[in-house]
From Swiss-Prot:
Annotated gene: pyrD
InterPro entries: Aldolase_TIM, DHO_dehydrogenase, DHOD_1B, Dihydroorotate_DH_1, Dihydroorotate_DH_1_2, Dihydroorotate_DH_cat, Dihydroorotate_DH_CS, Dihydroorotate_DH_I
Protein name, entry field: Dihydroorotate dehydrogenase B (NAD(+)), catalytic subunit
Cofactor binding, note field: Binds 1 FMN per subunit.
Binding site for FMN: S21, K45, A46, N99, N127, K165, I191, G217, G243, G244, G265, T266
Job description of the protein: Catalyzes the conversion of dihydroorotate to orotate with NAD(+) as electron acceptor.
Broadest EC class assigned to this enzyme: oxidoreductase
UniProt organism field: Geobacillus thermodenitrificans (strain NG80-2)
Catalysis: reaction(s): (S)-dihydroorotate + NAD(+) = orotate + NADH + H(+)
UniProt GO molecular function: dihydroorotate dehydrogenase (NAD+) activity
Binding positions (substrate): K45, N69, A70, I71, G72, L73, N127, N192, T193
C-alpha cells in the first residue's frame, strides 16, 4: 500500500506534495536537481492568452519571515505553453495542474478551453486574484458573485476538473468558498498571497516598483491554516493547501486543518530539494505518530471535537 497516495477529482497522486504555481516556473530549472516524476503533481506558472512581461523591477523583496513579490504574471503566453512547455513536461510521470489567469472572463474561458485539452493537463487552477479590467480593476476573487460566475463559465468549457485558488484578501473567505462550490468547482486551492508592502527608509519610497506585492512564506502559514480550518468545515469539495509550507510537519498541520494535498511555494527558492525532502520525510513522521495513511489526517483537528474560534481580536 502506498500510504501517501491521494485521489482527488482528476488527480491520482502518488503523494500529496506539489510545487505551487509561480514558484517552480515550468519545472525546467528544478529538473536539473532531481527527477520531477517523484512529485505528486506540478502546478505550472500562470498562463494567459498573450505573453506577459510582468511588472517593472524591483519586483521581489525579502521580509523577516518570507518575501514580497509583484512579478505581474510574467509568462510566455498560451501558444508557447502549449507548443513547448507542456510537451517538455510529458517526459515526466506526473500530472500537471495548469494555473490560468486573465484580464476578462472571455480570456479565462479561451485559455481554459485550449489548455485543458493538453494530454498531460489533469486539472486547472483558476487564479481569481487578477484584476477585472471591465469592472474597474477589482479582482475577480473579491466578490463572491463574480468569482462564481467566472467559475461557471470556465467549468462549461474545461475538459478537466477545475480548482479555484482563493485569495485571503477578502472579508469572508468562507462565503467565497461556498459560492464557488455552488458554481461547480471541483476543488479549492488556498491560500494565495496576502497584499503587503515594504518601504526603503533611506528613500522613503516603496521597495517594490509596483508599490505593493504578495506576501508569502512562513509568515502567512498561521493564516493559511486558520482559513483552511474554517473553509474545510463549510464545503464538501477537497482543498489543496498552501502558504508557508517548509517541512513534513507543516504538511501534516495543513492536513489536520482540512487539506487533502499540499503545495510548497516560497521554500523552493530557499532549497530546490524541499519537495522531495518532504516526500521522503512524510512516511517517517507518519510512523512516529502511528498513522497508517496520510488521508486519515484530513480534518482531524475538527473531526475530533476541536472547535473553530469565532471571536477574533
Amino acid at each position: 500500500m502506498n500510504r501517501l497516495a491521494v485521489e482527488l477529482p482528476g488527480l491520482s497522486l502518488k503523494n500529496p506534495i506539489m510545487p505551487a504555481s509561480g514558484c517552480f516556473g515550468f519545472g525546467r530549472e528544478y529538473a536539473q536537481f532531481y527527477d520531477l516524476s517523484v512529485l505528486g503533481a506540478i502546478m505550472i506558472k500562470a498562463t494567459t492568452k498573450e505573453p506577459r512581461f510582468g511588472n517593472s523591477t524591483p519586483r521581489v523583496a525579502e521580509t523577516p519571515s518570507g518575501m514580497l513579490n509583484a512579478i505581474g504574471l510574467q509568462n510566455p503566453g498560451l501558444d508557447k505553453v502549449l507548443a513547448e512547455e507542456l510537451p517538455w513536461l510529458e517526459q515526466f510521470d506526473v500530472p500537471i495542474i495548469a494555473n490560468i489567469a486573465g484580464s476578462t472572463m472571455e480570456e479565462y474561458v479561451e485559455v481554459a478551453a485550449a489548455i485543458s485539452k493538453a494530454p498531460n493537463v489533469h486539472a486547472l487552477e483558476l487564479n481569481i486574484s487578477c484584476p477585472n479590467v471591465k469592472k474597474g480593476g477589482i479582482a475577480f476573487g473579491t466578490v463572491p458573485e463574480v468569482a462564481a460566475e467566472l467559475t461557471r463559465l470556465v467549468k462549461e468549457v474545461s475538459a478537466v476538473p477545475v480548482y479555484v485558488k482563493l485569495s485571503p484578501n477578502v472579508t469572508d473567505i468562507v462565503a467565497m468558498a461556498k459560492a464557488i462550490e455552488q458554481a461547480g468547482a471541483d476543488g479549492l486551492t488556498m491560500i494565495n498571497t496576502l497584499v503587503g508592502m515594504r518601504i526603503d527608509v533611506k528613500t522613503g519610497r516603496p521597495i517594490l516598483a509596483n508599490g505593493t506585492g504578495g506576501l508569502s512564506g512562513p509568515a502567512v502559514k498561521p493564516i493559511a491554516v486558520r482559513m483552511i480550518y474554517e473553509v474545510s468545515q463549510a464545503v464538501s469539495i477537497p482543498i489543496i493547501g498552501m502558504g508557508g509550507v517548509q517541512t513534513a510537519e507543516d504538511v501534516l498541520e495543513f492536513f489536520y486543518a482540512g487539506a487533502s494535498a499540499v503545495a510548497v511555494g516560497t521554500a523552493n527558492f530557499i532549497d530546490p530539494f524541499v519537495c522531495p525532502t518532504i516526500i521522503n520525510e512524510l512516511p517517517v513522521l507518519l510512523d512516529e505518530l502511528g498513522i497508517r495513511h496520510i488521508s486519515e489526517c484530513t480534518g482531524r483537528s475538527w473531526k475530533t471535537g476541536a472547535h473553530a474560534v469565532h471571536c477574533r481580536s
